[in-house]
Design a protein with these regions (language model features):
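Core nucleotide-handling region used for phosphoryl-transfer chemistry
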Residues: 1-228
Length: 228
């Protein structure tokens, strides 16, 4: 099962500047992944669960509830979407393995840490097809974001990536009345609108000053790079 890679910061990697992109609200939680097997002995089954780097199950501390949440809310829904789009011209046609990536988060989660008593939920953030790469953003939007049964990050921007948009995110403070993006706390994940050669889908992230200041006030300096 594929692991979700680290997303570079825009100010460290400006590859996408000037490209046609789609930007999604960056939800603040923990990465969770699920493997789906379309063929073979485990045909049309979700066969494996994991955090970013480890396999988990319903008894795993911290992620057992995420597995249970997935089975209750998403197992049938996502299987239906995949099966319905596995025909001759479907995006999942001929794919031997699918990894679905989620964010496990609550309203008060911060830097991947959850607040006791908070209600946690899973939002689908990416889908990877073995040997084909990530699903392109517009396909992701059509298949999942437009389906009310699937929680996904809000689409914030579609267009050419320029500094006006980047700076609008950096300066956004959701705690202030009249801010441009009241739902954005941490920042955005920006994805190229189409795959490049080699099934590559470049991505980058932009964080808000508000979030970075909160990080620096809550955690020791030696943790900043890891959590940013």
């Amino acid at each position: 099962m594929k692991e979700y890679g680290s997303i570079p910061r825009f100010f460290d990697d400006g590859t996408l500047r000037g490209e046609q992109v789609v930007a999604f609200n960056k939800l603040d939680g923990q990465n969770f992944r699920v493997k789906y097997t379309p063929k073979g002995a485990t045909k049309k089954q979700f066969t494996m669960f994991g955090s970013r780097h480890q396999y988990v199950d319903e008894n795993t501390e911290g992620f057992g509830d995420a597995v249970k949440y997935f089975k209750e809310h998403y197992e049938d829904v996502l299987r239906e979407i995949i099966v319905n789009n596995s025909g001759k011209k479907g995006v999942f046609n001929g794919v031997e393995e699918i990894t679905l990536f989620f964010e496990w988060y609550g309203d008060n989660s911060f830097a991947g840490f959850h607040q006791d008593g908070d209600t946690l939920r899973l939002a689908l953030i990416d889908v990877f097809l073995k040997k084909k790469g990530y699903i392109e953003p517009n396909t992701f939007i059509d298949l999942f974001c437009k389906d009310d049964r699937v929680l996904t990050p809000e689409v914030i921007y579609i267009g050419k990536l320029d500094m006006d948009f980047v700076n609008s995110i950096v300066k956004n403070d959701w705690t202030k009345e009249g801010c441009q993006y009241p739902n954005i706390k941490e920042g955005v994940v920006i994805k190229r609108s189409t795959l490049m050669k080699g099934q590559r889908l470049p991505m980058c992230k932009v964080k808000t000053i508000w979030w970075l200041e909160q990080l620096h006030s809550r955690f020791p300096k030696e943790m900043w790079d890891k959590l940013e």
